[in-house]
């Protein structure tokens, strides 16, 4: 069993592997501010606010409408405590508009779910890591890979990595 929830002492979960590539790109491009969008309970938004705070980068999160559950309340509080600027986007269309309007020189856009080709390299890399562990005899070849999904970016990247490996 892979335990990506233990991948970082700051914030665990599948975003850590994605952000390894995304944040490297941010610094390579000399960006000084992060803009992202997501639901009120977005774990990607939480990861962004926490990693942004740790790196000294201002973060703006444009939230789209979502039921306010206990988890959503905790996510909002976590983002606020990390210093993120929280913007109410409302419906999806207005969220897209407000996110676009938030971008200016120096801004780095992280898509909802951190789901894009660059971020997906994190989970293609995870499949290579898994294959290496199997080849070294550290674990048996898995019969199945099970994971929760939101934007399905992780699922797509794992499937791509698995197809490359055969």
Task: Put a short name on every predicted segment.
Residues 1-166:
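PLP-dependent amino-acid enzyme catalytic core
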């Amino acid at each position: 069993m892979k335990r990506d929830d233990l991948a970082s002492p700051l914030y665990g979960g599948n975003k850590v592997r994605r952000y390894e590539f995304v944040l490297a790109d941010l610094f390579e491009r000399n960006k000084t501010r992060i803009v992202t969008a997501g639901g009120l309970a977005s774990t990607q938004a939480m990861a962004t606010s926490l990693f942004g705070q740790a790196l000294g980068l201002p973060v703006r999160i444009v939230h789209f409408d979502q039921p306010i559950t206990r988890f959503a309340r905790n996510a909002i509080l976590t983002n606020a405590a990390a210093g993120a600027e929280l913007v109410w986007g409302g419906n999806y269309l207005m969220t897209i508009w407000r996110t676009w309007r938030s971008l200016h020189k120096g801004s780095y856009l992280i898509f909802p779910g951190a789901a894009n080709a660059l971020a997906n390299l994190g989970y293609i890399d995870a499949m290579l890591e898994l294959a290496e562990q199997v080849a070294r005899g550290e674990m048996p070849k898995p019969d199945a890979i099970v994971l929760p999904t939101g934007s399905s970016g992780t699922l797509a990247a794992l499937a791509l990595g698995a197809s490359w490996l055969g």
